[in-house]
C-alpha cells in the first residue's frame, strides 16, 4: 500500500501535472459554457468525440508505444463495449433504472467484457511478434465486428438503438463530453501511476529487450497480458461512451480502417508519449469532424483523400528542424523548471540519480553473477581432448 501511494505521489510531480491541468481546465471551462448556454449544438458532440478518441489513443499507446507490440484490432474491443454496453443500458433503463446509473454500470460491464476478451485473445496472440501479431489482431477485430452484426440481440445489420442517446437528448443525464473527459482524467492517473511503478519499468524493459528481460527474471507473458487487458478495458469503456452518443450503433463503424486511424493517432503523437497521444487524438478528431462538415454532397468522396494528404504533411513536418526548434524553445517542462526554485530542482536530480544508481547496481550485479556462472562452468567442465592435427603421425 505504501508503494502504491508513493507511486501516486511521484505521478503528480510537476512534470507530470500538465496533463491533468489541461484536461481539467477544458472540462471546467466547457461545462460552465454549456450550462450557461454559450455552446453551439455541434461542440458538445465534438468534445465527446475528442474524449473517447483520447481514451482509445492512450490505451493503444500502452501496447504499441510502451510494450512495443503492434495491434491492429483495437476497434474490436471498442465494438464489444459499444454493443454490450448499449444493450445492457437499454435493459436497465427499460427496467426503471435511472439513466446515469445505467450508464455507469454499462461502462463497467462493457470495459470488463472487453478486458476478458483481451485476455482470451492476448494469451495465444502475444506469443507472436511483429507482423504475425498484427495479422492476428486484425483478424480478431473483423471477427468480433461480424459476430456483433449477426447476433439478433444486437439488431443485426440494422444496428442497435440506444436508450442512453435518448436520455442524453432529453437531458436526463449530463452531456457525454463531461463523462468522457472525467474518464480521461481517471485513465491518466491509472496509466501514469502504472508506468512510473516497478511494473512500468518492467514493461519498458520488455519493449527494449525481451530476451534480456526474461534473463533477469521478468515474467514477460504476465506483463504483456496485463498491458493488453488494461488497453482493452479502456477501449471497451470508450465504446460504451461512443454507443451512448449515437443511435443506432452500427457494425460498419468498427472496421479495420478505424483501427488504423487510432494507430495513426499513436504514431503521429509519438509512440511512448502520453502527451503526444492526447494532442494527436484531438487534432485528428477535429480534422475529421470539420472535413465531414465542409465536404458534403459530391465532395464527400474526396474526404479520405484530403484527410490522407493532411496527415502526410503533418508527419513530414513534424520532424522539420524549424518545428523542432520551436518545440525546444517553448517546451513546457523547461518553462516550469525555470519557475521551480533551484534547491527543489537539485532534489529532483538527486532522487533520479539515486534511482538510476540502484538500477545500474542491479544490472552490474547481474553481469557479475552471469560472469561467475560462466567461469564456474568452464572450471568444472572436463577438459576436452585436442583434435589431432591433420597430417600428424599416430
Where do the model's predicted regions map?
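Transmembrane alpha-helices and adjacent helix-loop boundaries
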Residues: 1-394
Amino acid at each position: 500500500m505504501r508503494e502504491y501511494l508513493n507511486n501516486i505521489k511521484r505521478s503528480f510531480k510537476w512534470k507530470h501535472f500538465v496533463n491533468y491541468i489541461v484536461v481539467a481546465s477544458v472540462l471546467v471551462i466547457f461545462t460552465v459554457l454549456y450550462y450557461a448556454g454559450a455552446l453551439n449544438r455541434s461542440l458538445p458532440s465534438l468534445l465527446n468525440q475528442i474524449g473517447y478518441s483520447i481514451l482509445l489513443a492512450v490505451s493503444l499507446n500502452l501496447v504499441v508505444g510502451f510494450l512495443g507490440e503492434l495491434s491492429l484490432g483495437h476497434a474490436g474491443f471498442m465494438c464489444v463495449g459499444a454493443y454490450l454496453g448499449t444493450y445492457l443500458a437499454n435493459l436497465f433503463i427499460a427496467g426503471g433504472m435511472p439513466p446515469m446509473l445505467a450508464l455507469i454500470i454499462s461502462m463497467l460491464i462493457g470495459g470488463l467484457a472487453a478486458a476478458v476478451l483481451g485476455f482470451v485473445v492476448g494469451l495465444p496472440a502475444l506469443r507472436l511478434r511483429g507482423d504475425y501479431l498484427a495479422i492476428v489482431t486484425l483478424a480478431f477485430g473483423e471477427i468480433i465486428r461480424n459476430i456483433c452484426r449477426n447476433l439478433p440481440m444486437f439488431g443485426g445489420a440494422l444496428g442497435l438503438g440506444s436508450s442512453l442517446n435518448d436520455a442524453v437528448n432529453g437531458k436526463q443525464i449530463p452531456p457525454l463530453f463531461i463523462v468522457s473527459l472525467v474518464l480521461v482524467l481517471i485513465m491518466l492517473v491509472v496509466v501514469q501511476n502504472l508506468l512510473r511503478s516497478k511494473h512500468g519499468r518492467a514493461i519498458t524493459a520488455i519493449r527494449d529487450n525481451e530476451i534480456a528481460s526474461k534473463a533477469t527474471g521478468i515474467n514477460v507473458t504476465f506483463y504483456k497480458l496485463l498491458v493488453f487487458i488494461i488497453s482493452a478495458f479502456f477501449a471497451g469503456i470508450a465504446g460504451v461512451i461512443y454507443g451512448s452518443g449515437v443511435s443506432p450503433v452500427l457494425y460498419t463503424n468498427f472496421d479495420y480502417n478505424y483501427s488504423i486511424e487510432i494507430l495513426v493517432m499513436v504514431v503521429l503523437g509519438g509512440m511512448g508519449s502520453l502527451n503526444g497521444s492526447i494532442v494527436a487524438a484531438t487534432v485528428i478528431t477535429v480534422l475529421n469532424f470539420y472535413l465531414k462538415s465542409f465536404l458534403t454532397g459530391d465532395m464527400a468522396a474526396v474526404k479520405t483523400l484530403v484527410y490522407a494528404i493532411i496527415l502526410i504533411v503533418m508527419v513530414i513536418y513534424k520532424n522539420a528542424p524549424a518545428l523542432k526548434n520551436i518545440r525546444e524553445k517553448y517546451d513546457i517542462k523547461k518553462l516550469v523548471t525555470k519557475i521551480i526554485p533551484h534547491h527543489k530542482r537539485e532534489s529532483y536530480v538527486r532522487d533520479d540519480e539515486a534511482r538510476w544508481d540502484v538500477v545500474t547496481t542491479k544490472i552490474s550485479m547481474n553481469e557479475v553473477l552471469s560472469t561467475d556462472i560462466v567461469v564456474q562452468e568452464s572450471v568444472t567442465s572436463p577438459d576436452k581432448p585436442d583434435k589431432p592435427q591433420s597430417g600428424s603421425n599416430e
